Amino acid sequence: MVTRSEILVRGIVQGVGFRPYVYTQASRLDLRGRVRNSTGGVLIELEGKQGDIVQFVADLETNAPPLSAIESVECNHYLAPADYPDFVILQSAEEPGESAGETQFVPIAADFATCIDCLKELSDRSDRRYQYPFINCTNCGPRFTIIEDIPYDRERTTMREFAMCAECRSEYENPLNRRFHAEPTACHACGPQLFLSKAGSDNELFRSGGRSPLQEAAFRRLTNPASKQVANSGVLEQTRRLLLAGEVVAIKGIGGFHLVCDALNPEAVARLRGRKYREDKPFALMAASVALIRKHCEVSDEEESLLTSPCRPIVLLERKPSSNVPHAVAPGGNNLGFMLPYSPLHQLLLKDIDRPLVMTSGNVSDEPICFADNQASDRLREIADYFLWHDRRIHMRTDDSVARVHDGREIVLRRSRGYAPEPIKTALKFETQILACGAELKNTFCLTRDNYAFVSHHIGDLENLETLQSFTEGIEHFKRLFHLRPEAVAYDVHPEYLSTKYALATDEIARKIPIQHHHAHIASCMADNEIEGEVIGVAMDGLGFGTDGRLWGGEFFVADFVAAERIAHLANVPMPGGTKAIREPWRMAAVYLQHAFGDEFLNLELPFVKELEQRGWPTLRSMIATGTNCPETSSMGRLFDAVSSLLGVRSTVNYEGQAAIELEAMADRDSLGEYEFRIDDSAGVIESQDVIHSAVSDLLGGTPPAVVAARFHRGVARLITTVAEQVRAQRKLNRVALSGGVFQNMLLLTEAKWRLRASGFEVFTHARVPTNDGGISLGQASIANARIKSGRVN
């Protein structure tokens, strides 16, 4: 018997080849009807045998297009037949009675790596897109970085500047073609092209956004696709030769510019570091294949899956001792950050290069990545020797994402290209649309709607005008794309954060909700894991403004989404010089030594102490004694810095977390022993004197610093477990949430999770959003939502 069904599919189902897929599946099962994009997702009407319709739904749920993400399939079966003669794809339309400004909302896909089908065409000499650097289809290519407005069609992307040729138009309009309504569709004949120029040349022209006269003349001479293909190939061959000759090339990609050089050329690496003012922070690498990466790093099956995933993040991998990548690429660490080519341009560039390339963000240190041609020409001309340009505009800058595998699963450390703007689906219902402004460092913002949390791409450190502009532009773009009108704004309680000042100055949002930094960390972990109710929250990081006006960072809470009760914390110590103590960890080492030994520590026969007079200890001691510019802190991150400096690892740093990263790298994992913190149960204060005494005693006794480093890590893991056990005994809680930048330390995280699980705890850590401050905005939004729903906020 013939019956009819209506099926609404919600999720990331538009712009990802979903309607052609539905058309093909319906035709295969001899079903009639129609499919169209609706304001809620994709609406399908099917008419035929009920068994075939059931089979269609089953296939839909298990074998959807690769870039889609189905969140729900709502079926209304056994409707009266409409006698459809065939199956057709209809144009998009609003639902009757709906207001587009209020209800039209469909998640937008991220930018995804080149798919297998496009890669085959890229290398097929008989294909008309052979070696075309911008090949794409509905299963891959740019999305977020080229969208200017919605609904998502070519006229609202930067591809509107390229009129499709007849062949591309035919594919674009063919429901059975995988380029059906693939908005970035292009080819040699009608799409973007490559150009190579020496740094500093044609500078005025790039300011105006056009091509140079030379480029324009060359472009006009190319009258057919074959000659354009030859020209693009020639540009790429020239670029390869320049890189292998030791030059630094700024290459325009999908979300911005990279600064690129030969990773095996120490002189090129050193030159890039010097020009970029990036002394030690590790560079990312790109290699043509997993096989090439395996020459330099250990790669597990899970890590290979992550490397080859459509998101194509930079994956942190364990470096092999046999690797010939210069240590200057990633000084002081045991890891290398590798990614595979994710765009056809990268695929073609690396095709004949049997070595990794440095592929670092195209920016001056501390500034956001360059994405506009004129901006890159101005900012990067003193860093790059050459520029490899293309003429497809980037609308939204996006950095590479960073991830790693831990405990068998992916954990995201920087969520950007390939992940954003896809929303984080949560167990929470956001009845109020909220803007959460995030933290100062590693900033992201978050906007909410329904069950979605739109955590932004990585913005960076909000410490200059350029990054603040990127932050504000990003917020407006997300509001426009997802039809969001936030009614509340959540922000960090630190009064000097630029994100806080922005929130307080936002006049159009009256409801303002301050959120304590470390409560936001714990809430972020809870939202990431889709759990509710009270947890034992452990928040450890560099610092965050506490409710008592001090700088927190070694905190234990009993927390839920509404409130956080501070149960225990590291003892407060002075931070002489304020932020200067972050850049100069020796200051914290001196503080902790004085805290443990008094001024008698100056008699200790330690190399650190012998060098202290030259570093200005008398001035520092005076500052501590008088409290001059000495904010108090309970930060675990600062304690890691102190131990690192005490062991002679790092007395000054050039990037955030460097001292702790190098301390972790040098720790002897095969050694035995651990240090013990003293806990004042009545006050919940955790004293570190015994740890410092033990470390000094070991050093004086000839224990290698690598063993001391390992014992310190185990001591912190033991502390976490001990406090959690005490809280469990008092409060009958058995769930522990670990959050904060300190838990990027894999040695500590592994040890802490193992001990907690051995003690019977259920342990929650981050996966979908970073454990560092990049996840703060999700926590802020979750807390604000809970407080609004509970009536804690008017």
Provide a role label for each language-model segment:
Residues 518-540, 544-546, 585-594, 718, ...:
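Glycine-rich phosphate-binding/hydrolytic loop that grips phosphoryl groups
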Residues 63, 156, 171, 179, ...:
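Internal gly/pro-rich beta-alpha loop/helix module
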Residues 191-193, 439-477, 591-734, 747-754:
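A contiguous, well-structured pocket-lining segment that forms one wall/lid of small-molecule binding clefts
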Residues 492, 509-521, 734-739, 746, ...:
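Conserved phosphate-binding/catalytic loops in two-lobed NTP-binding clefts
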Residues 1-184, 188, 192-195:
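Intrinsically disordered, low-complexity, mixed-charge
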Residues 250, 483-495, 731-742:
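Short glycine-rich phosphate-binding loop at a beta-alpha junction
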Residues 256-319:
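A phosphate-binding glycine/aspartate-rich beta-alpha loop in the early core of alpha/beta enzymes
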Residues 294-299, 348, 369-376, 401, ...:
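Conserved phosphate-binding catalytic cores of ATP/NTP-utilizing and phosphoryl-transfer enzymes
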